[in-house]
Amino acid sequence: YLSWGFSVININYRLANTALAPAAVEDSRCALYWVINNAEKYSFDTTKIVTTGFSAGGHLSLTTGIMSPETEFDKQCPSHDLDNKFDNKKVKVAAIVNWSGITDVEDLIAGDNKRNYAVEWLGNNITNTEIELAKKVSPINYVRSDLPPILTIHGDKDTVVPYAHAVKLHQKLDKAGVVNQLFSVKGASHNYFSKQQTQQIYATIKEFLIKHQLI
């Protein structure tokens, strides 16, 4: 990304062993506010913000990029203007590059694809309260027509974050008329792409960003 002319901000967020959901979502949203509020200081172009991440980072790149400025997860941000003087029109991204990200948290705690790591993130004791929170932090539930372009990269043999999550998001985005692309990595698991596959992935990302005039 640096070689493509981007300024890169690699954020830290609270993990499950430090704070349960929705802390990571809040931290990532706050990072977006920080970027926008510090754009002049660091010469960031806020019309070309791209969120990206792998696995949990893919999930957070989606939630950060597609939630509306009025979301409850912004309220704890130090830079959030509680008097509503902040220009909400600026709180948006130009594109999202999602690598193997979770799209439906509810599915991972109470659905067909239940995973222990997701249950732990919600606090292990899953009640209706946790299920409602899972819905709120699921990117699939924020799909609407005015979203930025989204590129999803996912191995079709991924069993950690089911490949079905990528397919489901792609289908729902298509139905809503959102510009998006699903790059399926054939035979790839969750945490391994071959050198050739990695080269293909980055070529696809670059082509995607050029297409949307972000490079």
Model-found features: residue ranges?
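Alpha/beta-hydrolase superfamily serine-hydrolase fold, recognizing
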Residues: 1-215
